[in-house]
Amino acid sequence: MRKKTVALVMTAALMGSICLTGCGKSTDDTSKETTTAKQAESKKDDAVSVDQEKADEVADLIDAIYVQERNDNTDKQCSDAKAAWDKLTDAQKELVEGENADPDYFGRDTGDASKDDARNQDEIGENEILVVSFGTSFNDSRVADIKGIEDALQTAYPEWSVRRAFTAQIIINHVQARDGEKIDNVEQALERSVSNGVKNLVIQPTHLMHGAEYDELMEVVENYKDKFESVKIAEPLLGEVGSDAAVINEDKKEVAEILTKEAVSEAGYDSLDAAKEDGTAFVFM
């Protein structure tokens, strides 16, 4: 009986030793590890919270300049938004999300803005051609399309100074904030014309047709007409109409033919006649 008792005691001691060794930790050690893990998780949560706060600050700055009429604070707001964006880490930039703001506002690569010319220089002279466009924040497109038109006009009329204005303040702010390129809106451009002593002003819009942007342009120009000896405003590309329905605007005809050809091709037909035979109709809206 005594041997059995001793054996049981030794077994219990051995099991206790194994438990302490196998489990490896005392209650105090486990408690400390749990506390450390919670602290690490808390620090991680705090870091995420700080990242989001910084991203939200930039989102608010972008939203403030995204859609607005130009005011005395616009220049500073644009530079502040870009400066705040530049301070973010790559991870924080991905968190930027607002009513209109997102990482693409500053982060998307749209080409080299240095290849563009804002054409907002003074020393205009007496004769000016003001090219008015809605605008685009895509740098490569702006250089190829809008600048391309402006350059062509300057080549065709070397005695006139060609300048630029955009009607979309949302585009102007975006380009200025992201690339530091300042493009005049219509009022700024007209004020520049007046201060430079322009006498003869020709306004060449790049709008395709009559619409809100063109109507707003006409309203703004009306307030400045008495400040020049002559003001001429060209029609939109597809804005001219004939004296009656029988007179067709050749520009409209050419555009309609190009659109039709492209639509037929996209639909998988070799010709418009083939589409007709198949019972397919194309509606342009």
Where are these regions (language model features)?
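Beta-rich interaction/scaffold domains
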Residues: 45-109
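Bacterial Sec-dependent N-terminal signal peptides
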Residues: 1-9
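Low-complexity, Pro/Thr/Ser/Glu-rich flexible segments characteristic
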Residues: 29-49
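Bacterial lipoprotein signal-peptidase II cleavage site
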Residues: 19-32
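Short, flexible helical or helix-coil boundary motifs
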Residues: 16, 65-69, 197
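Extended amphipathic ligand-handling, pore-lining, and cofactor/metal-binding catalytic surfaces
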Residues: 47-50, 102-285
